[in-house]
């Protein structure tokens, strides 16, 4: 059986641009794409922590080291500059591949600069 599992996420990045009339997608600083193992044109889920919106689009490269997180096209109506986002990617895994599977969790500072990459989500206390 294949299961759709979290592959990676960019945790609490800050939206820098919302470009309604751009062709579409979400431009992400190339350093962050690499840290999260997200390829250009890969589907991503975006969860807006600020307003609760959730939507899917695809990733494109923004200039390396720029800190850019630009939500483009119609999705620009779902995020504004300054909004905090979680950007997640998923992959399908066979059950045998899941032993030891741990998604990449990428953390940033307020300028979307990489601060830490973790390999597991801690257990939430009661």
Curated annotation (Swiss-Prot):
Cofactor: pyruvate
Described function: Catalyzes the pyruvoyl-dependent decarboxylation of aspartate to produce beta-alanine.
Entry EC number(s): 4.1.1.11
Keyword annotations of the record: Autocatalytic cleavage, Cytoplasm, Decarboxylase, Lyase, Pantothenate biosynthesis, Pyruvate, Schiff base, Zymogen
HAMAP family (UniProt xref): PanD
Protein name: Aspartate 1-decarboxylase
GN (gene name): panD
Catalytic activity: L-aspartate + H(+) = beta-alanine + CO2
Subunit structure: Heterooctamer of four alpha and four beta subunits.
Catalytic residues (positions): 25 (schiff-base intermediate with substrate), 58 (proton donor)
Cofactor note: Binds 1 pyruvoyl group covalently per subunit.
Alphabetical list of NCBIfam families matching this protein: panD (TIGR00223)
Pyruvic acid (Ser) PTM positions: 25
Post-translational note: Is synthesized initially as an inactive proenzyme, which is activated by self-cleavage at a specific serine bond to produce a beta-subunit with a hydroxyl group at its C-terminus and an alpha-subunit with a pyruvoyl group at its N-terminus.
Family statement: Belongs to the PanD family.
Broad class of enzyme this protein falls into: lyase
Keyword Lyase tagged: yes
Residues where substrate binds: 57, 73-75
Chief localization: cytoplasm
């Amino acid at each position: 059986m294949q299961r759709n599992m979290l592959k990676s996420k960019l945790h609490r990045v800050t939206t820098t641009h919302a470009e309604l009339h751009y062709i579409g997608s979400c431009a992400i600083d190339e350093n962050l794409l690499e840290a999260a193992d997200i390829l250009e044109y890969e589907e991503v889920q975006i969860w807006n922590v600020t307003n609760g919106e959730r939507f899917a689009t695809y990733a494109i490269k923004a200039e390396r080291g720029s800190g850019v997180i630009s939500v483009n096209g119609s999705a620009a109506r779902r995020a504004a500059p300054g909004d905090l986002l979680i950007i997640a990617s998923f992959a399908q895994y066979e059950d045998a591949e899941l032993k030891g599977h741990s998604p990449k969790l990428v953390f940033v500072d307020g300028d979307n600069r990489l601060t830490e990459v973790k390999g597991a989500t801690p257990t939430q206390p009661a």
